[in-house]
């Protein structure tokens, strides 16, 4: 059962979306890995991204949660997972690590150890899925962090900590004012799971939050204004926004290494496949469809499965092919007789004047190595997906098939040429196709 989002909160979300306009390109093109603790701040973060996804502004994010083994509350950790799993239709990565034992071994504080392990894990996940990390820091956290760093001897850089976007970490809650955060928390009835350690005076950050911050606020300190004094919201500079990448042609199909898929958990596998679909400008799989796809993958047989947008195809030994239904490889070829140019699947080739392009009829054969071989058998051996085979061009002359144009499917594969002298001119890419 999904949480409701009130109209007042939706208005705030919409206003925040406009404020983070410099990050729209990144947010819309890459999946987010959301760091979710279960507390108030990360709950707002999670619902904000849930709203963005419902509004079709972003690809489906992934929810990451780390049990630090500090709560000693297995029941609450179970509830956090059950809540996230039943409420948000996203991939989820939940992990457990004995942070107290690790901190003793490293000689660092619990906070430092937990943060280091968390970010190392988040970086690994975001790199794997070509996404970005999202955390729930806001201006009050910034004020706490300044004081914490100054107490520990920090200098000028203490004031520039927690930027909008740094080290592939995005912090959208800085676009919320403290008043807006309070309004949301008062308006909504979302489940909140507070970490018991947040109430312990054992930790310096908690003592700053409980005793120093309230004093500063009573004296008129404004965390929002202080943060803006030292941070400007700017479009992130990244290779992903270069002109070369922005003009990148969407491929006609993608292959996913079956060994990689087999090494992933169910949630990781869905996130991985959905990321590939996003690269093809397609929507993620539904839960039911993904279940059917997983069942077929586990049987290790050949199969062809489709939804409204995509063909999923695999032979017994091949990788998994993802082919959009609007892919150029599922359309008929084009032939320009004046130039003798054959075009298909975004590729093209010049052909000799004595050959005619055609589609392969059922039962057609080609003479190769002194034998007459069925073309369907060659395409099967070359692991050409079944939905593609009927559109793959051939060249014929004198009522016989002389060439199977495999290079138009994949330039790395050579054409199959019959046992006769046929002049095949070099392939070349068609600009802008």
UniProtKB/Swiss-Prot annotation:
Its EC number is 6.3.4.19. GO terms for biological process: tRNA modification. It is found in: Cytoplasm. It catalyses: cytidine(34) in tRNA(Ile2) + L-lysine + ATP = lysidine(34) in tRNA(Ile2) + AMP + diphosphate + H(+). Keywords: ATP-binding, Cytoplasm, Ligase, Nucleotide-binding, tRNA processing. ATP binds at residues 37-42. Its main location: cytoplasm. It holds the Pfam family ATP_bind_3. InterPro entries: Rossmann-like_a/b/a_fold, TilS/TtcA_N, tRNA_Ile_lys_synt, tRNA_Ile_lys_synt_N. GO terms for cellular component: cytoplasm. The keyword Transport does not apply. Ligates lysine onto the cytidine present at position 34 of the AUA codon-specific tRNA(Ile) that contains the anticodon CAU, in an ATP-dependent manner. Cytidine is converted to lysidine, thus changing the amino acid specificity of the tRNA from methionine to isoleucine. The N-terminal region contains the highly conserved SGGXDS motif, predicted to be a P-loop motif involved in ATP binding. NCBIfam families: lysidine_TilS_N. Belongs to the tRNA(Ile)-lysidine synthase family. This is tRNA(Ile)-lysidine synthase. It comes from Leptospira interrogans serogroup Icterohaemorrhagiae serovar Lai (strain 56601).
């Amino acid at each position: 059962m999904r949480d409701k989002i009130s109209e007042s909160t939706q208005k705030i979300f919409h206003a925040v979306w406009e404020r983070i306009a410099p990050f729209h390109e990144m947010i819309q093109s890459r999946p987010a890995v959301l760091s979710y603790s279960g507390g108030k701040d990360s709950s707002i973060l999670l619902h904000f991204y849930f709203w963005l996804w419902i509004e079709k502004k972003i690809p489906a994010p992934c929810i990451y949660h780390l049990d630090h083994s500090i709560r000693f509350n297995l029941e609450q950790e179970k509830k956090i997972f059950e809540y996230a799993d039943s409420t948000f239709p996203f991939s989820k990565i939940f992990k457990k690590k004995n942070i107290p034992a690790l901190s003793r071994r490293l000689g660092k504080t619990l906070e430092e150890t937990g943060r280091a392990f968390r970010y190392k894990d988040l970086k690994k996940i975001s790199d794997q899925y070509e996404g970005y990390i999202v955390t729930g820091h806001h201006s009050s956290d910034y004020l706490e962090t300044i004081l914490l760093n100054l107490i520990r001897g920090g200098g000028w850089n203490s004031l520039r900590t927690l930027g909008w976007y740094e080290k592939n970490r995005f912090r959208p809650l800085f676009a919320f004012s403290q008043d807006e955060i309070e309004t949301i928390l008062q308006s909504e009835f979302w489940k909140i799971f507070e970490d018991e350690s947040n109430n312990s005076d054992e930790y310096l950050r908690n003592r700053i939050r409980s005793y120093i911050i309230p004093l500063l606020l009573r004296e008129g300190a404004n965390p929002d204004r202080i943060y803006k004094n030292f941070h400007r919201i700017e479009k992130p500079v990244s290779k992903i926004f270069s002109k070369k990448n922005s003009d990148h042609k969407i491929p006609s199909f993608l292959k996913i290494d079956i060994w990689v898929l087999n090494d992933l958990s169910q949630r990781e596998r869905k996130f991985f496949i959905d990321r590939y679909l996003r690269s093809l400008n397609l929507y993620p799989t539904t839960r039911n469809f993904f279940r059917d796809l997983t069942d077929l993958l586990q049987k290790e047989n050949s199969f062809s499965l489709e939804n409204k947008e995509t063909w999923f195809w695999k032979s017994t030994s091949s990788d998994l092919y993802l082919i959009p239904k609007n892919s150029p490889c599922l359309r008929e070829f084009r032939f320009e007789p004046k130039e003798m140019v054959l075009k298909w699947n975004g590729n093209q080739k010049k052909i000799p004047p004595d050959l005619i392009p055609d589609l392969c009829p059922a039962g057609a054969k080609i003479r190769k190595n002194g034998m007459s071989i069925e073309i369907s058998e060659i395409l099967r051996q070359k692991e050409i997906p079944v939905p593609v085979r009927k559109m793959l061009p051939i060249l014929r002359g004198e009522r016989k098939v002389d060439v199977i144009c495999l290079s138009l499917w994949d330039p790395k594969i050579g054409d199959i040429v019959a046992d006769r002298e046929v002049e095949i001119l070099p392939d070349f890419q068609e600009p802008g196709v």
